[in-house]
Amino acid sequence: VTKIISFYSFKSIGCTTAIAFIAKHLANKGKKVAVIDFNLESPNISNLLSLETFQYKGVVDYFYERALSLSHQCSTTINDICYRCNLSQNISVIPTGDIDKYYIHRASELDRGLIASFYKKDFNPIRALINDVKKLIKPDVILIDTNSGINDLSSIAINDLSDVVYINLFPNEIHFKGLTIILEAIKRSKFNNKRKQPVINFILLPLPHMRKKKLLKKVEQWIQKNNIKDFSNIYAVDYNYEIVLSGIDIDESIYTDYKIIANSI
């Protein structure tokens, strides 16, 4: 059974980097990994994972055509938007698409209600995409990079698609306030969708090493204060300038914190 895992942050922080390193480690262990970029506003996973080719089509094209078509048969298929990663043949990437004037228009249209409308129709392009990925790639795991903030596509990825969710945060009041709302929405969705609530994990990053214990304590206090019970683990990722400067193509010994997370999947 393919496990579906989403990475989310209320403020844009660290999701794409986490996915890239986790995908790399899982692939090195022999797992087949599919990475889907739902971060329509600031897509970057295709750059970080160094795709072999890029033919200018992606998630936005797949959704947009199916939103407007009266038929399920569209010119853009899963074969057109799935690309191999240079780092490993075990990693397949479904990017958002080429960032041109057409992309901006289509992404804006999707953001203005088309995504939500998929759930009012018999045919749902989002679920169709996931099923197509499963059939074509047969991955052990699907990793989804989501938009930050509160939006339809991230909500769908978390509440309707995912078995596990990793929530990236930095322990300050902005994140705490936003995540309190998000966690309540996840809890309510468990009843609305009649499906099992996803397993919630927190990733704290990027943490200055000298302040790690203090910041972890702050998160634990927030969890206790808000009576947050439905979560599994808290992971802490140290700030590492080598990751910032070098990207993903670095020695495994440098990204140990991400390997710990990957090994839990």
Residue locations for each model-derived region?
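P-loop/Walker-type NTP enzyme "switch/lid" segment
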Residues: 40-134, 245-247
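Conserved beta-strand segments of the P-loop GTPase G domain that flank and frequently precede/overlap
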Residues: 7-8, 36, 95, 143-144, ...
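Walker A/P-loop phosphate-binding motif and the immediately C-terminal alpha-helix
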Residues: 2-42, 47
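Well-ordered beta-strand positions
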Residues: 141, 163-164, 233-235
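Conserved C-terminal guanine-recognition region of P-loop GTPase G domains, centered on the G4
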Residues: 179-192
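Beta-strand-loop-alpha "switch" segments that mediate conformational coupling across diverse proteins
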Residues: 97-98, 206-252
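Conserved Switch II/interswitch segment of TRAFAC-class P-loop GTPases
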Residues: 148-149, 162-181
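Switch II (G3) loop of P-loop NTPases
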Residues: 117-122, 126-157
